[in-house]
């Protein structure tokens, strides 16, 4: 494993790896120890007490963060008829039908989120092997398969983020940029925390919020004290 640079080592020395910080302290420290020479993303990782091998303990969804993520999302919408105009007026970057299916099959990926109306899923389904591994396949659980394309596009543009528990029960998400005020990052953190708390499967036993960490792109991780987290 490659040794971290001097700048990282200096930043990491400011974080007590044996200590668990309050959400406010963790975010403040993560901002202070950002080593990137650009406006880095502030990321969170929630390790949940779930068994993702069980169908009733799958956690997946989407949430609109009150202050957005600071990242501009390019939205592709698959729709027909009036829904094309609706998507365009809502601010979608690309809107079309089978023409975009062919374009993607040829290697085009200049988009970040895909939305589709239910009547287009027959066509979009052809892209499962391409979009699936990239986490771009539209899904009703995240609100990206819907007839209300206006709402879907507007929410994505406003800062909607998708979340999904990985095999180890870890949910990764971006809650903003280092340039954000600490208060805004805390608001975004709490919004995601509340959504995950409400998503706790009834069959999940034991401690739910096992561990939480805040970090920035290329920065050191800061452990969060979860003892006050409510379900």
UniProtKB/Swiss-Prot annotation:
SUPFAM superfamilies: Ribosomal protein L1. It comes from the Bacteria. CDD domains: Ribosomal_L1. GO terms for cellular component: large ribosomal subunit. The keyword Transmembrane does not apply. PROSITE patterns: RIBOSOMAL_L1. One of its GO terms (molecular function) is structural constituent of ribosome. One of its GO terms (biological process) is regulation of translation. Keywords: Repressor, Ribonucleoprotein, Ribosomal protein, RNA-binding, rRNA-binding, Translation regulation, tRNA-binding. InterPro entries: Ribosom_uL1_bac-type, Ribosomal_uL1, Ribosomal_uL1-like, Ribosomal_uL1/biogenesis, Ribosomal_uL1_3-a/b-sand, Ribosomal_uL1_CS. Part of the 50S ribosomal subunit. Binds directly to 23S rRNA. The L1 stalk is quite mobile in the ribosome, and is involved in E site tRNA release. Protein L1 is also a translational repressor protein, it controls the translation of the L11 operon by binding to its mRNA. Belongs to the universal ribosomal protein uL1 family. This is Large ribosomal subunit protein uL1. It comes from Staphylococcus epidermidis (strain ATCC 35984 / DSM 28319 / BCRC 17069 / CCUG 31568 / BM 3577 / RP62A).
């Amino acid at each position: 494993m490659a040794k971290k640079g001097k700048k990282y080592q200096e930043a990491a020395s400011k974080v007590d790896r044996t200590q668990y910080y309050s959400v406010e302290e963790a975010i403040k420290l993560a901002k202070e120890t950002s080593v990137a020479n650009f406006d880095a993303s502030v990321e969170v990782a929630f390790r949940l007490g779930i068994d993702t091998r069980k169908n009733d303990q799958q956690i997946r969804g989407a949430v609109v963060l009150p202050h957005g993520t600071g990242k501009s999302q390019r939205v592709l919408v698959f729709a027909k008829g009036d829904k094309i105009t609706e998507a365009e007026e809502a601010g979608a970057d690309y809107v079309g039908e089978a023409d975009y299916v062919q374009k993607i099959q040829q290697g085009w990926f200049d988009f970040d989120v895909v939305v589709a109306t239910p009547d287009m899923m027959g066509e979009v389904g052809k892209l499962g092997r391409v979009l699936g591994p990239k986490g771009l396949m539209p899904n009703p659980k995240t609100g990206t398969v819907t007839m209300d394309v206006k709402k879907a596009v507007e929410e994505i543009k406003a800062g909607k983020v998708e979340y999904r528990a990985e095999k180890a029960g870890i949910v990764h998400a971006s809650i903003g940029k280092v340039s954000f005020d600490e208060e805004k990052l805390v608001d975004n953190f709490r919004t995601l925390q509340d959504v995950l708390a409400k998503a706790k499967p009834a069959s999940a036993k034991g401690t739910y919020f096992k561990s939480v960490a805040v970090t920035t792109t290329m920065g050191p991780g800061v452990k969060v004290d979860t003892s006050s987290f409510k379900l």
